[in-house]
Amino acid sequence: LKKRLVDKGILSLIQQWLTAPVKLPDGKLIASTKGSPQGGVISPLLSNIYLHAFDKIVNNPQGKFTKANIRIVRYADDFLLMGKYYFSREILSYIHRIMENMGLTLNRDKTKLLHSCRSSLFYLGFEFRNIKSKFGWNTKNYTNVRPSMKSRSKLYAKLRELLAKRRHWTIEWIVWKVNQLLIGWLNYFSISKVTHIWETIKVIKKHLDYKLFKWMKSKGRKAHRKLRQRPYENLVKFYGLLDIEKYARLKTLAKAQ
């Protein structure tokens, strides 16, 4: 970092961050001797500073990556390189050498070579896959982008955990907690280029409707019988539950502008 930062005050602050002990859930403190804790707020910042040198190598107009017409997409220490498949093994070996020179190693479990026409690509919670579609006599390829099954499963698990054994909670409190969860998820995944977000939202609505029905039934109150007929729609109408289709449409339009 000293090669890229000249402000001694900032360097001192980063040094304190890196050497501060890590506090575990049980209250114990563990000394930090190397690296940054997983999920720490400073980790993405340090990754961006340190890997800026790698970005410059990849984007060098006269460099090996540019000559092979390879592009990079990077988020912190998680990156994709896209280009012609026949360059892939040569480029991968080159990346290994670059990382070694930087004192880093690639995660072999996460490092893969994929042909976009044959395999789905999973990145930052999204699934990218190549789809063939017929337009008249012609068959064209296009990229299908949608929230991955893993991302959807995580949302379902959080909803299940939220609604399980919460009989004592009021409807207003449940609506508030569910809205928090849905807004966070939709803010991330509602992007104009996500081609199948609406199909995903329909599935989420059905899942949420079923979970709300089970929760209301578990409370066993007569006052909830009418609400149980169409729990999702009724809670949207009478209790302010988020209309996820309407919200996603507004977010998609806002991000497209």
PLM ranges: what are they?
Residues 1-109, 113-116, 120:
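Conserved polymerase palm-domain catalytic core
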Residues 18, 23, 172-188, 206, ...:
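Core structural elements
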Residues 19, 102-168, 181:
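A conserved non-catalytic segment of reverse transcriptases
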Residues 30-36, 142-144, 160-174, 186-199:
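Short, solvent-exposed helix-loop connector elements
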Residues 53, 57, 90-97, 154, ...:
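Long, highly charged amphipathic alpha-helices
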Residues 72-75, 111-119, 177-181, 198-207, ...:
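A glycine-rich phosphate-binding loop feature that marks nucleotide/adenosyl-phosphate handling sites
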Residues 192-217:
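Short secondary-structure subsegments characteristic of cysteine-rich extracellular domains
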Residues 204-207, 216-257:
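Extended C-terminal regions of large enzymes
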